[in-house]
Structure formats: structure tokens, C-alpha cells
């Protein structure tokens, strides 16, 4: 779906863009990969109207748990986050190590392979430190030089006809404690203060300008304003009531100053209410251009019994609705840590189950706007976190429409 239906049909229609309805996107060869008629009569909506994507996890925000070989090769072994590694290596050495990583973790061949596997979307986690003048030189330590590599990835994906979501994964001060996905292993979340919001807003303005002025970003249609904030409505209240509406205002004002017409506005994405930070729409006065991100990791849902049929059944009836439109922006095939390597769940001998569970989840998430799997690749020797490895294992089909023929439910 390229443009999204208005959230309240009684109000005037003003649409931000998603691929396939009001704005078509094409590969450099002239192909529209969203304009494919599904061969399956079981589909409730045509395949061309759904996001089917992968996260570029650990490309611009490295999470050592899933990229241990790359982390070691960079000289970062034993460091918990990008901040820690840069501080340990020193700026110049770190910049070269990260440049080598950015130039190899995701390549143009990866992008082309994604399209061959029926994927039409990438979600790119980034940190605020891409805008290097936001970094406090006396107290913060992050790699420099990433923006050119982001341009390259977006250019390749645009040339391939893919839709692109850019996600502020690492916020100033860290939006979660002790989480490498924020770029730093902060003991406390420091994001929830006005001066940190101001830095994030500067990043969003800069990113918005870059997207609209750089042709390599031409297929970026969505900008997520913060990934996975604290799951505590009281602690997140200033974010909901101040940062979110300010982000909308600053992004829209930037677009207006650039002369961008409403049909070319970016979708502005927030975590949905299911995430647990509060109602993201609570203080918004203009949400026609809003989109919502749902992260669904069944492994951490204690209400689902830990057996195969319960997992299939839970996914078959999983309603991720609520805020509209929602994309399930992170999910995987991983199961609870204490059983993941037992005989009943071991990946190599249970491919039939994982294939059924993939189909059940994907079908459920396509009842919303679609899905983005975490992640495209991982260095775990475990396809449950790695889309490309799951395809190689025969768990995920290259013909994604065929998931409806599995009849997992």
C-alpha cells in the first residue's frame, strides 16, 4: 500500500505515501515490484498492497549479540556497544573499522537477493550520531562517516524498486537502559529530557531534508521517530506529549519549506499503543500522515504456552490491530532462550514447524499493512534470526504468496 487511507474518513483526505496506491516506485530497469498480482485465490488482499521486508539489523547500529564475528574483526571484542568500541579504539582507528563494516555487511548483492526472494521493503536502523555535529565531542563516542554508506544502501534499494523505512534506532541519551541497539550501554535511559528531544528533532529535520533533496533517498517513504522507547507510560509521558507532536511539526515544517506537496510527505512512524509507552496519538493534532510500528516477538509473550501447537494457534489468531495503519516492523522465529536448543525446538530438525509458524505469522501480519522481519542476516548459525539463512534452509519460501497454500491455521 502506497498511500494510506485516512484514519478518520469524516475528515479531509491528506495522504502520506506508501508504495502501490497513489505513488508508484520503479526499479532502475523500470520494474514495479509492488504491482504483482497474487496467484493465490486465498489472499484477502493482493500481494502488491502489503509490505514484505527485512531489517538491516547491525548495519548502522551494531548489536554484538547477532554480529559477533564482524564485531571481533573490527577489534571490538569485549565491548558492549558502538560507544564503548569507539572509546576503546580511538576515533581514527574506529572510523576505519566501522567504514570497513559498512562497506561489507550489506552490499548491493544483498539488496538484489532480497528482491529475488520476493521482498519489497527494507527498514534501516540508524543512530542520531549520523548527524555528526549532534555528538558531544567531549563526552560521546560514535563512529563518523556513516551517511555516505546510508546513501549507497538507499540508492541500491531505490534502483531495485524497494520501499525504504529509516528508523531512529539510537536516540540521544539512549531511550532504553543497557541496550546496545541504542548505540550505547547506558545504565539509565537519558532520552526523556527536553534537551535530548531537541537533538533528536534536529536529526529528524536533517534526515527529512536529506531524503527529499538526495535522489538516492527517493524511495524512502517513512521515518520512524524513535525505536522501542521505555515500556512505562509514566516515564514516557513527556515523549508522548512533547516529543511526538514536536516531531510532526518539525518534519512537516521542513517539508513545507522545501516545497514538498502533501502527496510526497513522509509517513511519520511511532511505536503503537501495544508497545506499552502510552497512546502515541494522545497529543497529536494532525495524524493523517502517521504510521505505527508493532514489534511482535512471541518468545517474550508469557501468555503463550511454550509448545508448538500453542505457538501456531497464537499466531493464527494474533490481531495486531489498534492504531492504524500498522506495520509489524520487527518479528522473528526465535523461541524462549531456555528451550531454543532442545530437541523439540532445535532448528535443523524442526524445519516443518518453523515453516508453518513463519506462514502463520506472516499471514496474521498481512492483515495489517505487512511486516519487516528481524533481520536480513545474523552471525548466529541460527536461521530463526536470519531471513536469508531461513530461505537457504527451506523454511521461508522464495515465493511468498505460497505461504497461503500452507494453510497453517
From Swiss-Prot:
Reaction(s) catalysed (UniProt annotation): Random hydrolysis of (1->6)-linkages in (1->6)-beta-D-glucans
Pfam families registered for this protein in UniProt: Cellulase
- In terms of superkingdom, the source organism counts as Eukaryota
Q: Which GO terms describe its cellular component?
A: extracellular region
- Where does this protein reside within or beyond the cell? Secreted
So which residues have sugars stuck on them? 35
Top-level EC class, please? hydrolase
EC number(s) reported in the record: 3.2.1.75
Record carries keyword Ribonucleoprotein: no
Family assignment?
A: Belongs to the glycosyl hydrolase 5 (cellulase A) family.
Summarize the protein's role: Beta-glucanases participate in the metabolism of beta-glucan, the main structural component of the cell wall. Acts on lutean, pustulan and 1,6-oligo-beta-D-glucosides.
- UniProt name for this protein: Glucan endo-1,6-beta-glucosidase B
Species source reads Emericella nidulans (strain FGSC A4 / ATCC 38163 / CBS 112.46 / NRRL 194 / M139) (Aspergillus nidulans)
Which gene is annotated as encoding this protein in its UniProt record? exgB
